Amino acid sequence: MKRAILIVLDGVGIGELPDAAKYNDEGSNTLVNTAKALGGLSLPNMGKMGLSNIEEIPGTPKEDNPIAFYGKMAEASPGKDSTTGHWEIAGLILDRPFPVYPNGFPKEVIEAFEKAIGRKVIGNKPASGTEIIKELGEYHMKTGYPIVYTSADSVFQIAAHEEVIPVEELYRMCEIARNILQGEHAVARVIARPFTGSPGNFYRTPRRKDFSLPPFKATLLDYLKENNYDVIGVGKIEDLFAGRGLTLSLHQDNNSEGIKNIFEAWNKLREGLIFVNLVDFDMLYGHRNDPEGMGKALKDFDDALPDIMKLLSDFDLLIITADHGNDPTTPSTDHSREYVPLLIYSPNFKRTFPLGIRSTFSDLGKTLADFFNVKNDLHGESFLSTIEEGWK
């Protein structure tokens, strides 16, 4: 029986990539800089796995005999967003980044969208979703104009009050936007952001829905599903892959629910992969430049690790990595172009080795495809033979 849990700590990078300057990310190191800002960060369980052997994290000592294989991975695709990172982990490398809109969407996009939905839009700028409904919610209620906004990610977001634009109508608008946003403006995701409440007290409802660009060719998830493995997505995995290649999806509102979902997914897994995204590091702390929050979230995850590790049988795998950086100590509130950590654990490892610096996140996807013994056309170079040495 082959089983693996792959956990992506969203935004938890481990040092600038050689091309970081092109992205204005020189000096970014999410893990190390967070630890420095806090005067040290104790992550004993990831420490035992070899986290500080990748790059020393102040407060987490290096381990003489790490219980996991450890290394770091470079991103071969251009860009530094979640979709790019997760697709590359799953074996796809992009040749151009998804478009982002730091100054809002161009006139031709907005005009085409307004014409198609038969009403004007307001906003059209990068913004925090909670802030923009505070700012424009009342005007939206008076006019019925939907609020369009973006973020540092490649997203076209539409916010609307549920009593002004019913949710099904909002979803229809998102489908229209998805059809318009193709070619040079093919954003990774169009997102419906319904809200309710009254001026001064607006709040978002759980009926958010993502309209994602599907991966342009088969990913690890597709190959596993085709070969009758279970592929369970936890968190925003379903959104990032447009629902493709999954046999079940579990969603959550925060990391602690996400960790509970790992246990629920494990109980449902016969044989296959649980692919987990824990987003709080990025969404709540990286984008808000909150190193204290980032540190606490990392400690909370580290505290939960022993119970996750106890789930595994002798030849199961637990993999911990990230999709990009989001250094909370830099002036930027955007993602950062960083290496990501790579820790691979199995309870029956007799010995472990460094995995070095992998030239693409796809090495991980290729290795997992090999582990599950599925024929594939993924990018990357498998290091399964190295991992198998651990069981000998």
From Swiss-Prot:
Keyword match ATP-binding: no
Cofactor annotation remark: Binds 2 manganese ions.
Keywords: Cytoplasm, Isomerase, Manganese, Metal-binding
Major localization class: cytoplasm
Binding residues for Mn(2+) 2: D282, H287, H335
Annotated binding of Mn(2+) 1, by residue: D10, D323, H324
Family assignment from sequence similarity: Belongs to the phosphopentomutase family.
Name this protein carries in UniProt: Phosphopentomutase
